[in-house]
């Protein structure tokens, strides 16, 4: 399969740089996976598309203020984007500077250069950095870090982003990008869903910066997926199995919930799904057989991204690309702060290979 098969024309004006005033106030494009039918509405329509006993699976990761500015002790400016917290003093990070720091280099971090750190080692594209500070890493990041807005949001982060670029149910710090489908859920909608009898469960996948990396190969099968840490605990497994047993649907909120659940299914032996704790590099594209998910809530994704490939594997390639063309024509807002889709599974999608 060619990466170019997943491109589409997107006017810059449709890229959302700020969220809606109300989280649940965005538009919702619904795609019936079986026949490709499209319906236009608002996000709160989701309440009427779900049935009592259906299970919504959310990702409860919390975005950390992972972007830090500073300079090398030798003088050059540096930008650090924390990819993963290793312990209370060390992180793995992407580093941008005119010249990459060498092991043993001292760094002065923060807008006021008040935090000292040392570059310990390089691991492929990531740098291991140790903070020389009495505070735990998370406290340091909360003090000097900036919210890591995606590269297509062409503006500096603002204080408001610390709340807006965070789901209302986030619990476990560790992500450097928000699970953006979840940004549309506010407390009134969550209450209404519970009152209707919709079940909820929470996985954790700490979204890494790799989610924004372009696919740099021509052929999809040649792409090497980045690793992200995921947790699917026993209570989620029990909720999924109970949902399936009563004939209801498992609905993933966001592609990160999809990847978590499908990773847990792949790791299971002699059962549909089992607890999963570890790194996942699952890469879902047309031809993949979904094992757990029946419906999906998701935002609109970048052209030629692994995420539009995941959606195509779920809804069918033709249905997906036609839906995106319609979304552009109807001027839906795209990407992290944009509008949403509700998609039901296309049972024939795995057999639809583009090209």
Curated annotation (Swiss-Prot):
Listed GO CC annotations: cytoplasm
GO molecular function: S-adenosylmethionine:tRNA ribosyltransferase-isomerase activity
Catalytic EC class: transferase
Signal peptide: none
Catalyzed reactions per annotation: 7-aminomethyl-7-carbaguanosine(34) in tRNA + S-adenosyl-L-methionine = epoxyqueuosine(34) in tRNA + adenine + L-methionine + 2 H(+)
Function: Transfers and isomerizes the ribose moiety from AdoMet to the 7-aminomethyl group of 7-deazaguanine (preQ1-tRNA) to give epoxyqueuosine (oQ-tRNA).
Similarity comment: Belongs to the QueA family.
Name assigned to this protein: S-adenosylmethionine:tRNA ribosyltransferase-isomerase
Native organism: Erwinia tasmaniensis (strain DSM 17950 / CFBP 7177 / CIP 109463 / NCPPB 4357 / Et1/99)
Taxonomic path: Bacteria, Pseudomonadati, Pseudomonadota, Gammaproteobacteria, Enterobacterales
Gene: queA
């Amino acid at each position: 399969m060619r990466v170019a098969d997943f491109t589409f024309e997107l006017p810059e004006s449709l890229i959302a740089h700020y969220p809606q005033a109300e989280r649940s106030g965005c538009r919702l494009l619904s795609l019936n996976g079986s026949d490709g039918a499209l319906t236009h509405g608002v996000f709160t329509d989701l309440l009427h598309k779900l049935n009592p006993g259906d299970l919504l699976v959310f990702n409860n990761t919390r975005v950390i203020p992972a972007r830090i500015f500073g300079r090398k002790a030798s003088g050059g400016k540096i930008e650090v984007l924390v990819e993963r917290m290793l312990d209370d003093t060390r992180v793995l990070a992407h580093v941008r500077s005119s010249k990459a720091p060498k092991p043993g280099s001292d760094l002065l971090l923060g807008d006021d250069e008040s935090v000292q750190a040392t570059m310990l080692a390089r691991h492929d594209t990531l740098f291991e950095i140790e903070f020389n500070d009495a505070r735990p890493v998370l406290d340091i990041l909360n003090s000097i870090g900036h919210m890591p807005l995606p590269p297509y949001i062409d503006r500096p982060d603002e204080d408001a982003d610390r709340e807006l670029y965070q789901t209302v149910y986030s619990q476990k710090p560790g992500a450097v990008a928000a699970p953006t489908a979840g940004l549309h859920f506010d407390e009134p909608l969550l209450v209404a869903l519970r009152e209707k009898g919709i079940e909820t469960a929470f996985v954790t996948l700490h979204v890494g910066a790799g989610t924004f990396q372009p696919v740099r190969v021509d052929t999809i099968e040649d792409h090497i997926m980045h690793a992200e840490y995921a947790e699917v605990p026993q209570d989620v497994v029990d909720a999924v199995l109970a949902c399936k047993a009563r004939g209801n649907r498992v609905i993933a909120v966001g592609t990160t919930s999809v990847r978590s659940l499908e990773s847990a299914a792949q790791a299971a032996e002699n059962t549909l799904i089992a607890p999963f704790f570890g790194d996942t590099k699952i890469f879902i594209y047309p031809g993949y057989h979904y094992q757990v998910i029946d419906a999906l809530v998701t935002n609109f994704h970048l052209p030629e991204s692994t995420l539009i490939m995941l959606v195509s594997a779920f809804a069918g390639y033709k249905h997906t690309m036609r839906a995106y063309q319609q979304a552009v024509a109807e001027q839906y807002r795209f990407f992290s702060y944009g509008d949403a889709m509700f998609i039901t599974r296309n049972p024939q999608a795995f057999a639809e290979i583009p090209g």
